[in-house]
């Protein structure tokens, strides 16, 4: 598999208006998803995990009860790539947020 090409957080955010640039100067995008309850949040994470494995691209995330905080960047490219955009779009699509 070829190394993904870095596009940068700013370019990604132009196409993902509900996401934000990660803090700390890192080239990454982030978003907090909120759900009805823990079961809904965990169901979201399960669906994302399956898609992430298919893409061989995995999110950084943190879950407490109904909240899932996600940060996306491609470690091999040291920044945001089309893989991050694909996974972010999938998350938006299935989240209902």
Swiss-Prot record:
Keywords of this entry: Lyase
One BP term from GO: tetrahydrobiopterin biosynthetic process
Protein name: Putative pterin-4-alpha-carbinolamine dehydratase
InterPro entries assigned: PCD_sf, Pterin_deHydtase
Catalyzed reactions per annotation: (4aS,6R)-4a-hydroxy-L-erythro-5,6,7,8-tetrahydrobiopterin = (6R)-L-erythro-6,7-dihydrobiopterin + H2O
Pfam families, alphabetized: Pterin_4a
EC number: 4.2.1.96
Presence of the UniProt keyword Lyase in the record: yes
Cited CDD domains: PCD_DCoH_subfamily_b
Highest taxon of source: Bacteria
Gene3D superfamilies per record: Transcriptional coactivator/pterin dehydratase
One Gene Ontology MF term: 4-alpha-hydroxytetrahydrobiopterin dehydratase activity
SUPFAM superfamilies recorded: PCD-like (SSF55248)
Record family assignment: Belongs to the pterin-4-alpha-carbinolamine dehydratase family.
């Amino acid at each position: 598999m070829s190394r993904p090409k870095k596009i940068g957080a700013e370019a990604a955010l132009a196409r993902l208006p509900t996401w934000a640039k990660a803090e700390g100067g890192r080239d990454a995008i982030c978003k907090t998803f909120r759900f009805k309850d823990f079961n809904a949040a965990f169901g979201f994470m399960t669906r994302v995990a399956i898609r992430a494995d298919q893409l061989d691209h995995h999110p950084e995330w943190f879950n407490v009860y109904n909240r899932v905080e996600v940060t996306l960047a491609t470690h091999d490219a040291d920044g945001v790539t089309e893989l991050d955009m694909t996974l972010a779009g999938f998350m938006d699509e299935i989240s209902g947020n």
